[in-house]
Structures are given as C-alpha cells and as structure tokens.
C-alpha cells in the first residue's frame, strides 16, 4: 500500500476484459482496485455503478479492447461517462491492447478508419489521457488531441532471452516489411542483426514467403510482431526459417489474440517457444505447452505512478532503455 499522501486522490478501476492484469497493475502502484459493478439488463444493455466516492480524484480505468471487442469498448465508454458524472477530476484510460488498431487507414475505397473512430469516441466521452502498449501503427497516436503514452513491450520480451543466457548467434526476424522498425528495436536490445521475411502481400495470411532477406542459417531466429491473431503468418514464418537453416526459432508478440485455430497451429509449429504478454487475457483452453506469457503489469503500473506524480515517462517510452 502506497503511503504517499499524493496517492490519496488516486483511484484505479478495472472492467471485465483483463482483471488479472489489472490486479498486477494495482499491486505495482500500491493501491487496491476501486469498487464498481458491471451488470446487464435482460436485453443485454450494460449498467455500471461506481460504488465509492471519486469526487476530485484522478482515476485510471483499465480495459483492453479485446474479445468481445464491441462489448469491451462500450463498457469503457459507459464507465468514463459514469466517472465523469461522479465528478472525477481526471479520467485516464489504460488500454493495454487497442482493438480496431488494424483499421488505421483506408486500404480500399469506401472503407472506414475505425481506429480513428475509437479515438474520437474516447475524446468525446472526455477521457483525459490514454496509456497503451505497442499500437499496431504508431501514427494512431495522432488520431487523438489528448496525451497518449505509447509504451513498448520490447524490453520485456528481450529480457526473456537475456535472463536465460540466449544471447549469442541471434537474428531478429520481421515477418514482413511493415514490421522492420519493430524488429530493429528488438535487435538493438539484443545486440543482434535483423532479417526480413519477404511477404509481398502482408494482408494475405495464406501466402507462403518467397524469400528471406538476411542471414539466418545456423542462428537462433526470433520472429517478432505486435500481435498473433490466426497464427498463420507466424506458422509459415517458422517453416520458412527452418527451411533456410535456422538452428532454433522463437516467436514473440505483445498481443495474443489467438483466434480460430491459432493455438493448434502454434503448438504444431517449428517454434521452440512462443512468448507473449498479458495485454489480452488468455483463457485456460488457449494455453499450450510452447506458450510463455510475460506480464506488462509492472510497466503499466510504473507509467501510472509517473503520470500521477507528473514526472517524465521518457524511459518507459524508449524501447532501447
């Protein structure tokens, strides 16, 4: 429990998407989660009640926009409205996984930009600030006119290898051209070169990679991406690296969506281990032998403390530190 008097006006609340992560964040911050209830009427309408006074408090609400994505975003919006009407002085939303982030541009005519719509809804609901981890596209920060603290899981993922002495003869692999920047940051942390899987059609999960740019033969290959959804791209990436002579292949991603038959694909894949974080709660039936889950609870807890204390959070922004 934090004894700092400045924390007397700090409140943390969690909604339904990821209570285990919220509890880890609260433990790191040193205060308990606030009391609230989320109920449903018989027709499915959501009703939220704040069960303690928050008048004049700085509030952080923890909610990933994950499956069921439409329910979780609506829960968050209703919660913000309830907090505002209860006279919270500031309402900060902690969104470990920002759902709809893949819809960040018009890929074809007459398509929406739903990542921008989510930002607009949060702003119109009068959220004060957003904290999130590894956006699918960094430019989503520009969809907001309120502060966005964009944190990175790369140091946490890199620590998995450092802590186990897996530091020699590495190569960090981007599964497509779009992820090169992410792979480069991870490579800097591990002191390793990078390679790129030449996927010419990044929206086609069934495409077999045509070639690999970079030397992977005899190396420990670490494939990194921001998310694993169906698992197809990771699976074919592991196959391509094994065929190219990689000694061992690991997979890393921040957000474990694991839709469709992703678990079966990853368990049967050439990966030695698949390392993810807990930005999304993984149900028990989606755990598998090769899965390793690391927690971003300390990262988000530290960010909340720094924001509350009005301290710079640069060291949390920079994946190289």
Swiss-Prot record:
Residues bound to D-ribose 5-phosphate are 225
Catalytic activity of the protein = D-ribose 5-phosphate + ATP = 5-phospho-alpha-D-ribose 1-diphosphate + AMP + H(+)
Record-listed Mg(2+) 2 binding positions: 176
Q: Which cysteines are joined by disulfide bonds?
A: none
**Out of the domains of life, which is the source?**
Bacteria
The record's annotation in InterPro entries points to:
PRib_PP_synth_CS, Pribosyltran_N, PRibTrfase_dom, PRTase-like, Rib-P_diPkinase, Rib-P_diPkinase_bac
Q: Which GO molecular-function terms appear in the entry?
A: ATP binding; kinase activity; magnesium ion binding; ribose phosphate diphosphokinase activity
This one is known as Putative ribose-phosphate pyrophosphokinase 2
> Taxonomically, what lineage is the organism?
Bacteria, Bacillati, Bacillota, Bacilli, Lactobacillales
What gene, per UniProt, encodes this protein? Answer: prs2
């Amino acid at each position: 429990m934090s004894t700092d008097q400045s924390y007397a006006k700090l409140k943390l609340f969690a909604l339904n998407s990821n209570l285990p992560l919220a509890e880890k964040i609260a433990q790191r911050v040193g205060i308990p989660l606030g009391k609230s209830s989320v109920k449903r009427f018989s027709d499915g309408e959501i009703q939220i009640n704040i069960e303690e006074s928050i008048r004049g408090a700085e509030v952080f609400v923890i909610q990933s926009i994950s499956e069921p994505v439409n329910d979780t975003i609506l829960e968050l919006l209703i919660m913000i409205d309830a907090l505002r009407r209860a006279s919270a002085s500031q309402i900060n939303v902690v969104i470990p996984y920002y759902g709809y982030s893949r819809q960040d541009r018009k890929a074809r005519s007459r398509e929406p930009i739903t990542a921008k719509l989510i930002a607009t809804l949060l702003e119109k609901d009068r959220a004060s600030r957003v904290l999130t981890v590894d956006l699918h596209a960094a430019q989503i920060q520009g969809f907001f006119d309120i502060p966005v603290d964009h944190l990175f899981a790369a140091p946490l993922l890199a620590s998995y290898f450092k802590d186990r002495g897996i530091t020699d003869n590495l190569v960090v692999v981007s599964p497509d051209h779009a992820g090169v920047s992410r792979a480069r940051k991870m490579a800097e942390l591990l002191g390793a070169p990078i390679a790129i899987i030449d996927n010419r059609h990044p929206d086609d999960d069934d495409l077999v990679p045509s070639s690999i740019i970079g030397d992977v033969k005899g190396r420990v290959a670490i494939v990194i991406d921001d998310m694993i959804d169906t698992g197809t791209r990771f699976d074919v990436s592991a196959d391509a690296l094994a065929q190219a002579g990689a000694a061992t292949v690991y997979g890393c991603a921040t957000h474990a969506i694991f839709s469709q038959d992703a678990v079966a694909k990853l368990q049967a894949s050439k990966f030695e281990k698949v390392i993810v974080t807990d930005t999304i709660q993984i149900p028990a039936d989606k755990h598998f032998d090769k899965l390793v889950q690391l927690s971003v609870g300390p990262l988000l807890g530290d960010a909340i403390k720094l924001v509350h204390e009005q301290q710079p959070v640069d060291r949390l922004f920079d994946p190289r530190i």
